[in-house]
Amino acid sequence: MSANIMKYSLKLFFAGLSSLILLSCAKPGFVTVENGQFVRDGKPFTYIGTNFWYGPILASEGRGGDIDRLTRELDYLQAAGLRNLRVLVGADGADGVFSRVEPTLQTAPGVYNDTLLVGLDRFLVELGKRDMQAVLYLNNSWEWSGGYGQYLEWATGEKALIPLEAGYWPFMQQMRKFQTSAESQELFYNHVKAIVGRTNSITGKAYADDPAIFAWQIGNEPRCFSDDPAVRDGFIGWMTQTARIIKEIDRNHLLSTGNEGLMGSENDPDLLRRINSIPGVDYMTIHIWPYNWTWADPADLEGTVNDAIDRTEEYIIGHAKMARELGHPLVCEEFGFPRDGFSPQRTATTRARDRYYKYVFSQVGVNLQGANFWGWSGFAQPLHEQWQSGDPYAGDPAQEAQGLNGVYVTDTTLDLIVNAINNSHNYNN
């Protein structure tokens, strides 16, 4: 045997040995990453799921809770094959703030609504019963759950701006301060430790040992909001520290950033690569919003959906290339498209959306290893176009027109989703 053949044989042997070691270490039901691929129970794993930000609120016994509805929604989702749910751990700050979801979980730094914490516990229990999993995000760069702005307000006393009132440019200028505010970040780190290190009050099981959690996520669309190198360094620094804290507490679960891709990285490939090269980050995420990004015309959604699909294809392929280079699976964990006529009405048709969804789902098992549409409205019956306290929760959070992007059980989109799940490559049932 030649020296080159011997070296190659040894390389294959050790690669196989490494895979066996990884498989032996992985706990049943937990998802790992091997050679850029999700693996669950020794098998390649891809999925189609949804965003269900309000799940833990429904699971609570307090204000906003509706356990009967939660059971109905989860049973429907499970039957449809939608077993990966991207979920908000909880909102921050006071109730009664315009465009913020409520009730809030963290009412003051380190002070929690215990009823909602038990709701989060129960939500995970209900997922586990159905062999479903959650991606749990801990922060938010946007106002609708408190996030950056609330931590800044707590640390500095500066009132957090609301973009629908102050405008998005002033809001983003304020939010960039979070990246260099050590006091704000420390408050967030304490929150991370409290949640990731939690033990479920119902089962007595540590969150770190619960296969109902697919992954922890640093935040919803964490953005730098700045071209300033010092601010960018601060941004990377706090995410790196957050990743370190999470992995020190929990080495069983995957970790992702919640980043949107280039559109959430100041359109800078170098910043995007830095974000996804943070130690401990296991897979790459992207979000795609054709209307928000002017890829689709709200006055002619059906006439411009093909343009949106073309732009989406380019976005996915470009990010898939970087993900492969980094050895990460790629998940489009948030994408949405308005109802026909740009109408929020529950009865509005979804022809353009269905065409758009069909394309994104076709990429699962090709350039994507997961896709979560935004968002699940299910059996909700919105009472107002702008969410008001006491209204049913739907896929669109409080700052958005209720029904515009949400998927109801009555939508034709559901048939398309079920067909996509049944036909997707390597889908692990």
Identify the residue ranges that each predicted region occupies.
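Active-site mouth of glycoside hydrolases
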Residues: 30-296, 304-329, 335-428
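C-terminal motif of bacterial Sec signal peptides marking the signal peptidase cleavage site
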Residues: 23-24
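Accessible peptide chain termini
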Residues: 1-2, 429
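Bacterial N-terminal signal peptides that target proteins for export
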Residues: 3-14
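Amphipathic alpha-helical protein-interaction segments enriched in hydrophobic
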Residues: 8, 330-331
